[in-house]
A protein has these predicted regions:
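Hydrophobic residues in alpha-helical segments
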Residues: 32, 42, 64-65
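A short helix-loop-beta-strand connector motif used in the catalytic cores of GNAT acetyltransferases and
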Residues: 59-73
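Acyl-donor (CoA/ACP) binding surface of acyl/acetyltransferases
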Residues: 1-27, 31-39, 75-187
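Conserved GNAT-fold acetyl-CoA-binding loop/helix
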Residues: 38-59
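Short, conserved alpha-helical segments within structured domains
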Residues: 45-49, 70, 141
Length: 187
């Protein structure tokens, strides 16, 4: 049975995954929410003002009182900066699975942070939430994200062809998943 425990702090070797705070607004603007390329790959709008980011933070922060809400600020321990986010944005209570989404600012990409955060959230899902399956998707054009997903040990499930229309062309959506038994066999 799925157990809802909400967004609790997770610590890894180089990161702290914690609830968003209003003081994260400047780092969010600096590192990712105003970056059109990142937001496009993430299928999110660009936020260009503190007021817009405050509205986004209002949505996140007001949801933390729900035990079935899972969204973390990804904070680099060394700098104390909020460098991205990760979430179980879709949680299916009936079928005991959840889907991860993540976003890391371009200054911090290709350093293993997305992999480190994703592995921690996978473990949280299986160990704390009692999930049966974790799934994750990426656009076919997002090669760095595909590498993160593969490094985390997900199994490729299939491609939804021409799923997104971006910049005048169609882009596919890759689906990956990990079952509890697969996670446990890697321990």
């Amino acid at each position: 049975m799925l157990t809802h425990v909400g967004t609790n702090t997770i610590e890894t070797e180089r990161l702290i995954l914690r609830k968003f705070e209003y003081t994260d607004d400047e780092a969010m603007l600096k590192y990712w929410v105003a970056d059109e390329k990142i937001q496009s790959l993430y299928s999110e709008p660009v936020y260009s003002t503190k007021e817009e980011v405050k509205g986004l933070l209002d949505k996140y922060i007001s949801s933390y009182d729900k035990s079935d809400y899972y969204r973390w600020a990804v904070v680099e321990k060394k700098s104390g900066e909020c460098i991205g986010q990760i979430a179980y944005f879709l949680v299916d209570n009936k079928n005991h699975f959840a889907e991860i989404e993540y976003c890391i600012g371009s200054d911090f990409q290709c350093k293993g942070y997305a992999t480190e955060a994703t592995r921690a959230v996978i473990a949280y899902g299986f160990n704390k939430m009692n999930l049966h399956k974790v799934q994750i998707c990426t656009k076919t054009i997002n090669k760095p994200s595909k590498r993160v997903i593969e490094k985390c040990g997900f199994t490729y499930e299939g491609t939804l062809r021409d799923y997104f229309y971006m910049d005048g062309e169609y882009v596919g959506r890759l689906y990956f998943s990990m079952l509890r038994t697969e996670f446990e066999s890697k321990l």
